[in-house]
A protein has these predicted regions:
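Alpha-helical segment of the N-proximal tetratricopeptide repeat
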Residues: 36-62
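Terminal, low-structured helical/coil segments at or just beyond the last alpha-helical repeat
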Residues: 174-212
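Canonical tetratricopeptide repeat
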Residues: 76, 115, 151, 185-188, ...
């Protein structure tokens, strides 16, 4: 899903270094002799910060073919694909970039983790999604944790791992209850109570069958 709230949070981290990024993203030769390309990179960032992800991707892709941009810019490209609902390409870029950007600020990384997890989830690659949701939980703000626990619960539920599903649904319920300001909290609290009960019933089925 598109999540403008997360995008805006990420942009707060970008603004500090935004003016330096075009300089350090390209080779020294490009910085000296191809100023139009540094301008192109700056324009790609402008498009990105304005939510014009398709236009941003066109410029990033052209520059990447010529110079091979660094991992952080590949992560930007992954986010662009995510916001364009192209989850396969989002996974391709984010899977490659994430191991190389561990030195970045925690909350910036949390947005890459969540976007990658959501991309795998939407591709029904639930086992692949879980580790990225878990990484997101480790570094995100408390009011953002519920969404990842909620998704992890579904990942396990789709694999019929009822105990793990129930545990994560319970964690999601706890965080949504603690943070009612989250947009989806009210509807998900009601849903989660039903989901938890359903998981508990599934956990009882093998025990009940022993007494038949």
């Amino acid at each position: 899903m598109k999540n403008n709230r997360q995008c805006k949070a990420l942009l707060r981290w970008f603004m500090v270094t935004l003016l330096l990024l075009p300089v350090y993203a390209l080779p020294v030769s490009a910085q000296k002799s191809k100023s139009p390309d540094t301008e192109k990179l700056g324009k790609a960032l402008d498009y990105f910060t304005s939510g014009m992800y398709h236009e941003s991707l066109l410029l990033f892709t052209a520059l990447d073919k010529e110079y091979t941009l660094n991992a952080r810019f590949h992560a930007f490209m992954g986010l662009c694909y995510y916001y364009e609902w192209d989850y396969q390409h989002a996974c391709t870029y984010l899977d490659e970039a994430i191991p190389k950007i561990e030195s970045l600020a925690p909350h910036e990384r949390s947005i890459y983790y969540f976007a990658n997890a959501e991309s795998h989830f939407n591709l029904e690659q639930y086992a692949e999604a879980i580790p990225f949701y878990e990484q997101h939980i480790m570094v995100c703000y408390p009011n953002e944790k519920a969404d990842s626990f909620y998704r992890i619960g579904f990942c396990y539920m789709f694999h019929e791992e009822w105990a793990n599903a129930c545990e994560n649904f319970e964690s999601a319920l706890s965080y949504y209850t603690q943070h009612p300001e989250v947009k989806s909290a009210r509807s998900r609290i009601a849903q989660l109570k039903t989901m938890i009960e359903g998981c508990r019933e599934k956990l009882q089925e093998p025990q009940d069958s022993l007494h038949i």
